Amino acid sequence: MAIPLRSLATGGFRRICTGKPPGASRLLKPAPCIANTISSRPFAAAATRASSSQPKILLEDRDNGFGFVRHNPAPPKPRTRSVTEIRGPYYTVMGPRYLSDVLETMGTHVDGLKFAGGSFSLFSERPLRDIIDLAHAHGVYVSTGGWIEHVLSSSGGDIAGAVDKYLAKCKSLGFDVIELSTGFLSLPPDDWLRLAERVQNAGLKPKPELGIQFGAGGDTSAAELQSIGTSDPSKVINMAKRFVKDAGVERVMIESEGITENVQAWRTDVIQSILRELPLENVMFEAADPSVFNWYIREFGVDVNLFVDHSQIVQLAGLRAGIWGKSDTFGKITTYRP
């Protein structure tokens, strides 16, 4: 088995040596060392210190706020359920001042920040580090997008070397999570697992992104996606189980395209099948539209893990809290946790 994420988070500091690292599975082949010291940082939140010092939101302040109003209290960070990851720079520019406004007002409700695709490579280093440091100060982990697809497909004859350099630079910048997407690539399952293990060995957390729609994750038109067709959902489920059970991956992302995005009818059967086979805390669903995350909360409750655009965080937080919603969820989202 691969080195579990939990052991990486609690194992202190360790040096990765040349060749097979201790505990690596037989899938791994000896490769040059990534000169990196592994620091402990949980996937569920980048820093817990900020969470305890953050002022109470008014909804949870019984003495001086609106705590008398019925609501669903949010679990404290770091969370493994009810996790919300938000999209950072992509559709809009986001710098430190913009992100500071988002996190100073809504940071309680944000667990992760994701840079879509390779958007982070378009920054100069100082403002990028400022964004990452700011997220960590608010107890928010930072994830790359699926840019490793570009690294794999454009690295010439030294793919392993390019991947190691990519991981080392992401680590040095302060990233916590590396998304492993293959929406545009045909990659053998064992190779995908090797990538996850390589990420773990670099002291980072792998977040495989899986979906039934080939060509998803970019700006491909709905008509083009439909002409490509979709994969059998069992392929996604089997791969997700291998990541979680065999490679120790803490959480996989389920791509929305082909399921709730760019489809004539939502494939809710795929979602139900995934959650029959995997625990809720090991899965995060992309919810590209408010009607989509409204459905997820209605069907699976407040504990479902969701990825949304940063512009939607207030709406999603209100829905999780049960203080507003659409006609089918308003006043209906509740919990029982005595």
Question: What is each stretch, according to the model?
Answer:
Residues T80-T84, G112-K114, G139-S143, D176-E179, ...:
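Structural preference for beta-strand elements that scaffold enzyme active sites
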Residues T80-Y98, A116-S121, S143-A162, L185, ...:
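Active-site mouth loops of central-metabolism enzymes
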Residues G95, S121-L134, S153-D164, T182-P208, ...:
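Active-site-adjacent beta->alpha loops and helix N-cap segments on the catalytic face
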Residues M1-K56:
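N-terminal mitochondrial targeting presequence
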Residues K114-L122, G145-W147, L167-A168, F175-P189, ...:
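Catalytic beta/alpha-barrel core
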Residues S53-D130:
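Conserved N-terminal beta1-alpha1 strand-loop-helix module at the mouth
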Residues S100-T108, R126-G139, D164-G174, L195-G203, ...:
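Acidic (Asp/Glu)-rich catalytic clusters
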Residues Q54-R79, L275-P338:
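C-terminal alpha-helical cap/extension of soluble enzyme domains
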